């Protein structure tokens, strides 16, 4: 991994801080829309620190610099940060959070500055409280982003890619129905308007897809929805005639992206109140808890704003019948591509003894996926990792500088694709030679956790927080664990990481119960730093299941797995599996064989590999 000398960049940033009387400057990862994955023009934290992981926050003082990130990226950050940076390993004992570290640095009446478009109102409030408790002066919102000024002309331009309509056969629900349901929520909340800032929520609401952020079919935009209007703020040059006509037919007004804050000021000053569709007078605005501090301030702050878990996000997370059918279908096609890839890779490495590096292998997988029906692109950077690289949880192989795949070591491939009918995310760990007993033990424990969660049945109202331990239990018995969540929501031809649901130990996963129609990943793992990494990831849908009893008159839920890729027989230790686990595995493999074999009628190499990997234990 490349390590960048950040000395000059930090020096220039500190000059700008001094000019503005700022002693501590916070640089979050997110863009103005709280996006997890961002466009190149918004990669400010990466530019200033050299750390390219998707999660983290940089904090710079006049003489120090710190980068905070979670356990997924400890290994990567330690390799990418230069001598100017302190790594704050979030979640470890006695390690301060970035907010705590920022507050500590503000002691003695110092000023903390931030771009208010890049943090939420709640984070701003908490940080302000911490700063003042530590003896700092205040948290100050700055009109200019100081990293942008350092970046100057080298900063990439904002993308202007075309926006297209997603046909209703894929979306399953028309725009007018979605707007009607959202307005009913405005009524229930007695809100004057909902200002929408999350890009995937806007794409879902209007059944549109774009290409402004790599791997995420979204576009830079805001939306304001009232009881009688819907306005989309977007660069109009991205809209073709068909998309313009479609929006007009759905009574959606289009205005320039850059004037959204002007429109908010006009809306605030136009009336002191308005009538909701139920006739109730309302003065308050509704925004998502993920909306920016700048947006909240422009709407009048706490006195005029209700911050809520987005009703659009809640609706989007519950897939309709068309979306669920699409997820099933695209995972079969995607599974076929992965099966062909793994058969090809084994043949190249073992039979033909070809030397392939990690990127060359990933390129082949992308080529195979691109042949599938309704393929659009990848859903994230493919993690193609051999040996010790597999222990880097979010490893990204670099073209021309990555490792040659070692057929005698573990190979981990975490990859996904965007299709018009759904989004995929699959991880498989393979070994093309003779794995060690330790590797087989770890793999089988991870597999047992995957099966335990896949087969779980739980009452309605259960959260992902409550069932996370099912995936970890077998590792825990051996004193092992992993430093990442067990599952995340998955969008329908949208972001591969989708809230508000998930499975993990974070408090946020205790806030929203799992519901039929939710689509999540199930991905336990184990990582031996410097040696190997193991992860097994499937995508599954929450469905209602029939039980003999119904305690508390509650329906009971379970999972339907949609990923159709075999597990690595070479890494399974059968003696560690129960009879029930073996039966589940055999049935699942038979299902995979039945649903994918039709793709390989003229491909004996792949068919032979598939038959071998799916034969009963």
Curated annotation (Swiss-Prot):
Domain of life: Eukaryota
GO BP annotation list: proteolysis
Cofactor dependence: Mn(2+)
Ligand binding (Mn(2+) 2): 414, 425, 537
GO molecular function, one term: metalloaminopeptidase activity
EC code: 3.4.11.9
Reaction catalysis annotation: Release of any N-terminal amino acid, including proline, that is linked to proline, even from a dipeptide or tripeptide
UniProt KW Manganese keyword: yes
GO cellular component, one term: cytoplasm
Gene3D superfamilies referenced in this protein's UniProt entry, alphabetically: Creatinase/methionine aminopeptidase superfamily, Creatinase/prolidase N-terminal domain
Keywords, alphabetical: Aminopeptidase, Hydrolase, Manganese, Metal-binding, Metalloprotease, Protease
Similarity comment: family membership: Belongs to the peptidase M24B family.
Protein's name according to its UniProt entry: Probable Xaa-Pro aminopeptidase P
Organism: Colletotrichum graminicola (strain M1.001 / M2 / FGSC 10212) (Maize anthracnose fungus)
Gene: AMPP
């Amino acid at each position: 991994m490349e390590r960048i000398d950040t000395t000059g960049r930090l020096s220039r940033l500190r000059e700008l801080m001094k000019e503005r009387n700022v002693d501590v400057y916070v640089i979050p990862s997110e863009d103005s829309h709280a996006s997890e994955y961002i466009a190149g023009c918004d990669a400010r934290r990466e530019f200033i620190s050299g750390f390219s992981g998707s999660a983290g926050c940089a904090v710079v003082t006049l003489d120090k610099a710190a980068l905070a990130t979670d356990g997924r990226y400890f290994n990567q950050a330690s390799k990418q940060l230069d001598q100017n940076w302190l790594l704050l390993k979030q979640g470890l004992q006695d390690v301060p959070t970035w907010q705590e570290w920022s507050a500590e640095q503000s002691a003695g009446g110092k000023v903390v500055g931030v771009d208010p478009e890049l943090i939420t109102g709640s984070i701003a409030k908490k940080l302000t409280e911490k700063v003042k408790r530590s003896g700092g002066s205040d948290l100050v919102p700055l009109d200019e982003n100081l990293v942008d000024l350092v970046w100057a002309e080298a900063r990439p331009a904002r993308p202007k890619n075309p926006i297209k309509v997603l046909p209703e056969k894929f979306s399953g629900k028309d725009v007018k129905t979605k707007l009607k349901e959202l307005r009913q929520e405005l009524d229930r909340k007695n809100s004057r308007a909902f200002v929408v800032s999350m890009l995937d929520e806007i794409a879902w609401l209007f059944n549109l897809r774009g290409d402004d952020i790599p791997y995420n079919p979204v576009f830079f935009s805001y939306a304001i929805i009232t009881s009688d209007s819907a306005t989309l703020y977007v660069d109009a040059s991205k809209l073709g005639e068909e998309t313009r006509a479609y929006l007009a037919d759905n009574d959606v007004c289009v205005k320039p992206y850059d004037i959204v804050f002007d429109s908010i000021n006009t809306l605030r000053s136009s009336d002191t109140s308005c009538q909701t569709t139920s006739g109730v007078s309302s003065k308050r605005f509704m925004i998502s808890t993920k909306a920016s501090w700048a947006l909240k301030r422009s709407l009048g702050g706490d006195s005029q704003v209700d911050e809520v878990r987005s009703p659009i996000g809640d609706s989007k997370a519950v897939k309709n019948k068309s979306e669920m059918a699409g997820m099933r279908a695209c995972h079969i096609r995607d599974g076929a591509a992965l099966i062909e890839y793994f058969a090809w890779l084994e043949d190249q490495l073992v039979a033909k003894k070809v030397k392939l590096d990690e990127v060359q292998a990933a390129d082949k997988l992308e080529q195979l996926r691109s042949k599938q029906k309704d393929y659009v692109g990848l859903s994230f950077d493919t993690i193609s990792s051999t040996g010790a690289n597999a222990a880097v949880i979010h490893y990204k192989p670099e073209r021309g500088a990555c490792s040659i795949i070692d057929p005698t070591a573990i190979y981990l491939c975490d990859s996904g694709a965007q299709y018009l009918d759904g989004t995929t995310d699959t991880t498989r760990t393979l070994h093309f030679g003779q794995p060690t007993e330790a590797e087989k033990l770890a793999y089988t424990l991870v597999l047992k956790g995957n099966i335990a969660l896949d087969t779980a049945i739980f009452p309605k109202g259960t959260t992902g927080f409550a069932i996370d331990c099912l995936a970890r239990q077998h590792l825990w018995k051996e004193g092992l664990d992993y430093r990442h969540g067990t599952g995340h929501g998955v969008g329908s031809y949208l972001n591969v990481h989708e809230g508000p649901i998930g499975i993990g130990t974070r408090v946020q996963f205790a806030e929203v119960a799992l519901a039929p129609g939710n689509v999540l990943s199930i991905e336990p793992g184990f990582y031996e730093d410097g040696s190997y990494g193991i992860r097994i990831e499937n995508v599954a849908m929450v469905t209602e299941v029939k039980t003999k009893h119904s305690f508390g008159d509650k329906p009971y839920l379970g999972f339907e797995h949609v990923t159709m890729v075999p597990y690595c027989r070479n890494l399974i230790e059968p003696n560690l599996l129960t009879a029930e686990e073996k039966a589940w595995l055999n049935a699942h493999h038979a299902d995979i064989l039945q649903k994918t074999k039709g793709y390989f009628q003229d491909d004996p190499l792949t068919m032979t590999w598939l038959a071998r990997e799916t034969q009963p234990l």
